[in-house]
Structures are given as structure tokens and as C-alpha cells.
Amino acid sequence: MSSAPNGRKKRPSRSTRSSIFQISKPPLQSGDWERRGSGSESAHKTQRALDDCKMLVQEFNTQVALYRELVISIGDVSVSCPSLRAEMHKTRTKGCEMARQAHQKLAAISGPEDGEIHPEICRLYIQLQCCLEMYTTEMLKSICLLGSLQFHRKGKEASGGAKSLDSKIEENAETPALEDSLSSPLDSQQQSWQVATDIENTERDMREMKNLLSKLRETMPLPLKNQDDSSLLNLTPYPMVRRRKRRFFGLCCLVSS
């Protein structure tokens, strides 16, 4: 080892030290910074889309609950049927639009079928599926209730004959309020046509939501397709990954907890 004339070790010059540091830790290129920036931006967009989809599913869940309360009110003597049917139509139309938007956003952020799936995406799939199933069930209930009350009114008109005003008022307290029992025959026919139109519109919306439910099940990620309904309720908090077959050597059996 070379040494200085006074016995001290010769230190490397500044140029040598700078070259050593440059070799040991090269600076980041412009492409590396671009990749890092694009990755964080993509993650931010995905999280924002996930939050939007979560809000849509929650709002759709609220619309389903509101529609269910309206269906329960069918036949209540304290509720005016024309206003009730108008509110049901408004709530049903808004709920169908929310369901379509939620399905589109959820399908856009779900990613590849055999890749890693965020647990929140799995939860949104299950929530949207349950809401759609309940939504179509409530539509079917409203169709049955409106149809039965319509049939009850027509049967009463056919067999009633001429009745006094007092008897009509007395029966009105016990008859479901599909329409005003004191209305004229012309008003009765018009309201009967409106009820039939509402039933047809509800049947159309129900078919559309059933088709949307079928599309949702088709686009559902594979880890959710391969599980039954009971296992879907117990989701792991970790990302779900498609299971692949593995070989184990030297084991007679494998018991999974």
C-alpha cells in the first residue's frame, strides 16, 4: 500500500470519490420517474372508481328499501292509490338506472377473471346481487298485489248491483284502497287502464333487472363463481386469488383448516 512521505495514507481525490459513488448508486432515469408516477396515478384512479361504485351500490340498496316500503303500502286504506303508484314508478325507475350504472362501474374495475381480486370488489358483487334479487322479488309482489286488487274491484262491480251510499261508505273502510269506491264509471275505467299500464311497466322493468342479474353472474370473478352462497358470506379480509392445483409429495392426505 502506498503512503505519503510523512507516513500518512494517501486518500483518494474528490474526483475518485465521486466516481465511486456514481458507480455504486446510479441516478434514476426519467423513465423510472414516469413509471412511478403512472403507477400511483393508476392506483388513485382505481380507488376513486371503487369509492364511486360503493356509493352507487349503497344508494341502490336505499332505493330497494324505499320501493319495498311502497309495495307494503299497496291496499292500505290511508294511502291514495294513484299517488302511491306514481311514487312507485318514480322510485322503480330511479332504482333501475342506479343498478345499471353500478353494474357498469363494477365490471370496469373487477379486472381479469383469474387475477387477484380486492375483497371490497367481491363484497360489492355480492351486495349488488342480493339487492337485484330483492328488487325483482318486490316487483313481483307489486304485480301480484295490484293484479289481485284489480280483480277484486272488477268482481265487486259485476256482483254488486245498485247499492245505497251508506253501504258504499261502510264497505270503503274495509276495502283496500285501489281506487275511490265512490268514483264514476268513467273514472273507474280510466283508473283500471292506468293500473294495467303500471303492471305492464313493472313487468318490463322486472325482466330488465333479471337480465341484468344474469349478466352480473356471468361477469362475476371466478373465485366468486366457484363458491356457494354460504361461503360468500364469510369473505376473507385478504385479496382472493384463483386457486391452482399443487402437488404435495410424501403426504397421505391434506387437511385444510
UniProtKB/Swiss-Prot annotation:
Example GO biological process: G protein-coupled receptor signaling pathway
Compositional bias ranges of the Low complexity kind: 180-191
Basic and acidic residues: compositionally biased ranges: 32-45
Subcellular localization: Nucleus; Cytoplasm; Cell membrane
Modification note: Palmitoylated. Undergoes rapid palmitoylation turnover. De novo and turnover palmitoylation are both mediated by ZDHHC2. Palmitoylation regulates the cell membrane and nuclear shuttling and the regulation of GPCR signaling. Upon depalmitoylation, it is targeted from the plasma membrane into the nucleus. GPCR signaling inhibits depalmitoylation and promotes localization to the plasma membrane.
InterPro entries: RGS7BP/RGS9BP (IPR026512)
Lipidation (S-palmitoyl cysteine): 252-253
UniProt entry keywords in alphabetical sequence: Cell membrane, Cytoplasm, Lipoprotein, Membrane, Nucleus, Palmitate, Signal transduction inhibitor
Region (Disordered): 1-45, 172-191
UniProt topology in membrane: Lipid-anchor
This protein's GO CC annotations: axon; cytoplasm; dendritic shaft; dendritic spine head; glutamatergic synapse; neuron projection; nucleus; perikaryon
Short sequence motif named Nuclear localization signal, residue ranges: 242-247
Function text: Regulator of G protein-coupled receptor (GPCR) signaling. Regulatory subunit of the R7-Gbeta5 complexes that acts by controlling the subcellular location of the R7-Gbeta5 complexes. When palmitoylated, it targets the R7-Gbeta5 complexes to the plasma membrane, leading to inhibit G protein alpha subunits. When it is unpalmitoylated, the R7-Gbeta5 complexes undergo a nuclear/cytoplasmic shuttling. May also act by controlling the proteolytic stability of R7 proteins, probably by protecting them from degradation.
Domain notes: The nuclear localization signal is both required for nuclear localization and palmitoylation.
Subunit structure, as described in the record: Interacts with 'R7' family proteins RGS6, RGS7, RGS9 and RGS11. Component of some R7-Gbeta5 complex composed of some R7 protein (RGS6, RGS7, RGS9 or RGS11), Gbeta5 (GNB5) and RGS7BP.
Family: Belongs to the RGS7BP/RGS9BP family.
Protein name: Regulator of G-protein signaling 7-binding protein
